[in-house]
Amino acid sequence: MRLPAEALKDARKIVCFSGAGISAESGILTYLDQMPKLWAPYDPRALETANAFRESPALVWGWYLWRRRQVDRAQPNAAHLVWPQMVNLGYEVSVVTQNVDDLHERAGSTDVIHLHGSLTMPKCFACHRPAELTSDQMEIPDEGALVEPPRCKRCRGKLRPGVVWYGEDLPPGTWKNAVSLVKNCDALISVGTSGVVTPAADLPHIALASGATVIHVNTVDVGAQAANELMLVGRATDVLAKIHESLSTGKNNDNG
């Protein structure tokens, strides 16, 4: 890991840009994994649209309740924990994630930017007002179930997940904040993202264009073509642990 450690040696501002691969090691299913029987006939992406919710609200709401329970039972892994540890080394670390779970926050990262929203923050499908669920409204069997969405206390519209569905735009303020962080970082470390979902996939390119070093961490080679771009193939927990170890050693040597 000498090369990435050397690339990060003079960095002060680091952006973690994370995707599904970082949470997969905590047991969070990805689109490639087998779904529970109730939803097995469906492509998960087909359930993540406003039209799907209009046509089958109980199917879609039940799907998201099951996913939320899956996240609640999961624990942050070493790849989530490394970012607060890097803060302790003196780096200014920001997290921009495509994930809708809260594992970064539970690992100790603060002010996480969720490009695609969050499972923990439902809202009204009609008036878009944020809502909170009671514990009984979050109950769902292990095998999943069709569940009619609760109603908004304000307008009686159906509650929907507070995530960005396919065909919907990212919240302008969220995207603006993410781009600002990326344009001003010294290094961007992309972890577990395929780099195909736009506009999120543009962030590494924005970082490169702004002169930052970009390090890709993935179980498959997603390509690194620019002079200031590195590709590290491996599990996020393993690769990031080695990077952190190298940086810690470097800091200790500098202080010694």
UniProtKB/Swiss-Prot annotation:
It comes from the Bacteria. Substrate binds at residues 64, 67. GO terms for cellular component: cytoplasm. Zn(2+) binds at residues 124, 127, 152, 155. NAD(+) binds at residues 19-39, 98-101, 192-194, 218-220, 236. Its EC number is 2.3.1.286. InterPro entries: DHS-like_NAD/FAD-binding_dom, NAD-dep_sirtuin_deacylases, Sirtuin, Sirtuin_cat_small_dom_sf, Sirtuin_class_III, Ssirtuin_cat_dom. The active site is at 116 (proton acceptor). Keywords: Cytoplasm, Metal-binding, NAD, Transferase, Zinc. Binds 1 zinc ion per subunit. It catalyses: N(6)-acetyl-L-lysyl-[protein] + NAD(+) + H2O = 2''-O-acetyl-ADP-D-ribose + nicotinamide + L-lysyl-[protein]; N(6)-succinyl-L-lysyl-[protein] + NAD(+) + H2O = 2''-O-succinyl-ADP-D-ribose + nicotinamide + L-lysyl-[protein]. The keyword Phosphoprotein does not apply. Its cofactor is Zn(2+). NCBIfam families: PRK00481.1-3. 2 residues (Tyr-64 and Arg-67) present in a large hydrophobic pocket are probably involved in substrate specificity. They are important for desuccinylation activity, but dispensable for deacetylation activity. This is NAD-dependent protein deacylase 4. The lineage of its organism: Bacteria, Pseudomonadati, Pseudomonadota, Gammaproteobacteria, Pseudomonadales. The gene is cobB4.
